[in-house]
Structure formats: structure tokens, C-alpha cells
Amino acid sequence: MGNCCRSPAAVAREDVKSNYSGHDHARKDAAGGKKSAPIRVLSDVPKENIEDRYLLDRELGRGEFGVTYLCIERSSRDLLACKSISKRKLRTAVDIEDVKREVAIMKHLPKSSSIVTLKEACEDDNAVHLVMELCEGGELFDRIVARGHYTERAAAGVTKTIVEVVQLCHKHGVIHRDLKPENFLFANKKENSPLKAIDFGLSIFFKPGEKFSEIVGSPYYMAPEVLKRNYGPEIDIWSAGVILYILLCGVPPFWAESEQGVAQAILRGVIDFKREPWPNISETAKNLVRQMLEPDPKRRLTAKQVLEHPWIQNAKKAPNVPLGDVVKSRLKQFSVMNRFKRKALRVIAEFLSTEEVEDIKVMFNKMDTDNDGIVSIEELKAGLRDFSTQLAESEVQMLIEAVDTKGKGTLDYGEFVAVSLHLQKVANDEHLRKAFSYFDKDGNGYILPQELCDALKEDGGDDCVDVANDIFQEVDTDKDGRISYEEFAAMMKTGTDWRKASRHYSRGRFNSLSIKLMKDGSLNLGNE
């Protein structure tokens, strides 16, 4: 009968065992090939089988080192969360120290309604397990995506909670170092649910005046001094300022299609307050954003000063009018999509059946008022207005620029369908297979750099080699020099935009990025 009769909990438990046991974890000594004893990470906790006291059920989330499961305490039947960190993935002394420090910091910080509570840490031969309170309301990140952005009043409330977490950490000698929307969960699904910080995996203890040089964090939320390898607790306020900017407008203040481009934007420090919806946002909110994103950490606000700022103090009086809609958020998402995905969407558009494309075609024909086969900015603005989608001129211009690969200032039918496909997310596996075959010219089951370059050349531009290399850096996740169908489908389904990119973390990659920035002159270390 196979697996059909087993409970999800049984499957989950077996998955945990398969993840952490077996020959992959076994270590052999140099002499006789005998297995060495499993590594010990936490010296102050008893070694025990977690399943003696807890039932591990369905998977809730997955990170670079750990898998988080729904966890049921056998004695009380309480629902909890368990983050299981595989020892097999702790390959270096630095990795082991990170886990030790994460546990130490969660035990060190006082109990707070804004920080997830660690019930206990335990360890067996295969993993370190952190048993924590369960937060069922989902990520702050996901609520931003679902809404596009918050009202000012809601943004002020969320920002207050985030900065209170920062203040608590700094008061107790901890720098978080990885503040981002994904690391905050709502306790429940209610609108007024408490918000809790959950992940302290990159956090570190500090003493007043102490400086750090290791580049860690998530690209879009990094302070400039992190890139310059000379930073202190002020970086958490910068990251909170980036989150505030996103809460108010739906995109980060510094973004580009490559990590190097993002880093250079951060170092330039130019903040856009002109694009919608910023003209409708209060000056006090903008003032706070500016002071939190102050490039000089010595002049940047402290957590205490942020909480004393008039916009936070008067949060209940802040405007409660929605600042935009989900369509705007999706348009922005499309605007940072790489050229590979844009091309693939156009290929898919050509394969759509008459039924699938009929509604899109009707909309295009209605917008193309002069019947010349293209939609101008004015026609697009008028059409979106007719379809009850209120977009400012800057938003429409951004949409045109995102898909208008030839720089005509207009959209032809194929480009228009590509936009609609992305917004409606109608591409299925059959469409993706056809699009993949278009790029896989030799039919060997992989897209090679030259094949991608040749496809990009069809849309013009002589920089296809550099663009193809950048795309491979992002999409070729197993780094075998080719793009498989699975990697292609993952890119198409999740998007190669800032939301996906913000989840990536790699010490090696950021160290390499820092070297690049020094070589091209972006970093001016002499000013520190």
C-alpha cells in the first residue's frame, strides 16, 4: 500500500530521521575508517531523543541549515514549533558556533511579547532541536505581499514593534544583524495579532564601541557600513528603516537585478520619495524614514529616538487610508524581473490557446484605441482607468519600461500578454515545458549559457554575455553551469525579484561581493 495509510506526523518523523542520520552523517577517522563520535554542539543540554517527548508533525518552513516542524508535546498536547538543525549541514566550526550563539542569545534575552519564546533546546546524534512557541499568523513578509503595502497607521504600529525588539536586543548587548519581514511572524491570523521576532541565527553579542567586519544579513536590508566591514548595533535601525519603506510603498528603497547593483545602490544612498504612493504619505513618515536610513551610523537615530519620533508617538492618529493596492505591488514585482523571465513569458504568450488569451486580447483591443497594434502610455493609462486600476503616470511608465525591451515607449501585443501572464499567474507546467524547449535548442534537457545568450540577442542589446552570466548566477542554483527544467520552473513560479532575493544568504558570496566593490571603487574605506 506504500505511504498512503501513514499519518503526516509519521512521514515527518521519518523525514527528520532520514535528514539527520545514515552514511552522510557518519565521519571516519584517518586511520582505520571507523565512524567517529557524532559532533556535540550544545554542552549544557542532555543528549536525548526528541521524539520521546515531542511528536514532530508537518513541515512549517525550511532554511539553509534547519527545518521547522509543527511540534506536539506528548504530555500536555500543546502545539509548538520545532526548528531542527541538521548536524550534517554544520560543516565548519563557524557553523557550529552560529548555532551555539543562537541558542545562547535566545536564552539570554528576557521574555517579551514581541520575541518568540524558546521553550527548550535539545540535541541528539543527528540534530540540534529548538522547541519554541508556535506562531500561526504567518510572516509579516507575506502580509506585505498580499496587501502591496499598509496604511500609515498600520505601518507605524508594525514599525513600533520591530524597533522595540531592536531596543530590547541592544539593551541586552545583542545585535540582530538580519532584520527583514520574513523574520517576523504574527502570533495568530487576527488583524491585530501580536508580531514576534523569530530568527536569531545571525545575531551576535556586542560590547559598547565594539565593531564587526563579517558581512552577514540579507542584501536589500544591509546597512552601508556592513558592506564597508566596520559596523555596530546601528545596522539594525537601518534594516528596520528598509522594512518601514517597504511597508509604506511595497518595494525596498535600494534594489537592482544583481547583488552588486543592490550594494552600489545602498552605498549611493539615494531614496526615492517621488514615485507613488509617496506624494500621498505624510512628511513626518518620510522624515522618520530619512533618519533611519541615514548613511552615517553616528547620525542615524537610535532605537529610543525612533520610538520617541512624532510619527511613532502619534501612530493612532496617522492616516488610515490604504496607500495603494495589490496590482501596484505586482507591477513593481514585474519591473525588477530579469530579462530571461521576460523573454520566457513572451514565448509562453505565443503558445497560449485562443480561450486562454481571449480575455487578454479583449483588454488589449479596448486599450488600443487607434488600432495600430501597439498600446501607448496614454492608451495604457486610460485603459487601466477604465478597468478600475488607478495607476499614477510614474507607475505606468515603470510598467512600460519593465517589458519594453526595445525602448519604444509602447507595448506591442506580445509584451502586453507577457504583463498579463505575470499578473494573473496563468502559466502552467505545459506552458513552461514549451518555453524551456525554446531556450534548450539542442534538446539535451538543459539551457546552456550560449543558448541563453543567443535567445537574449533576439531582443537586441550587445550585453547578452554579461546578462547571461548574471542570470546563471541567480538561476543555476546547483552551480553546474547549466539550467535544468526544475531550476527554470522555480524561477518562473517564484520570480527572480527582491522578495526571493531577500531570502538568500551566503558568507562566501558576500565576501566576494565586498572584494568586487573595493576593486571598482564603490567602497571608500578611507572615510571610516
From Swiss-Prot:
The active site is at residue 178. Its main location: membrane. Pfam families: EF-hand_7, Pkinase. Residues 355-390, 391-426, 427-462, 463-498 form the EF-hand domain. Keywords: ATP-binding, Calcium, Cell membrane, Kinase, Lipoprotein, Membrane, Metal-binding, Myristate, Nucleotide-binding, Phosphoprotein, Repeat, Serine/threonine-protein kinase, Transferase. It catalyses: L-seryl-[protein] + ATP = O-phospho-L-seryl-[protein] + ADP + H(+); L-threonyl-[protein] + ATP = O-phospho-L-threonyl-[protein] + ADP + H(+). ATP binds at residues 60-68, 83. GO terms for molecular function: ATP binding; calcium ion binding; protein serine kinase activity; protein serine/threonine kinase activity. Its EC number is 2.7.11.1. It is a lipid-anchor. Residues 54-312 form the Protein kinase domain. The modification Phosphoserine is found at residues 43, 218, 484, 522. CDD domains: EFh, STKc_CAMK. A lipid is attached at residue 2 (N-myristoyl glycine). Ca(2+) 3 binds at residues 440, 442, 444, 446, 451. Residues 17-37 are annotated as: Disordered. Residues 318-348 are annotated as: Autoinhibitory domain. The keyword Phosphoprotein applies. Ca(2+) 1 binds at residues 368, 370, 372, 379. Belongs to the protein kinase superfamily. Ser/Thr protein kinase family. CDPK subfamily. May play a role in signal transduction pathways that involve calcium as a second messenger. There are 3 contiguous domains conserved in the CDPK subfamily: a kinase domain, an autoinhibitory (junction) domain and a calmodulin-like domain. The autoinhibitory domain (318-348) inactivates kinase activity under calcium-free conditions. This is Calcium-dependent protein kinase 13. It comes from Arabidopsis thaliana (Mouse-ear cress).
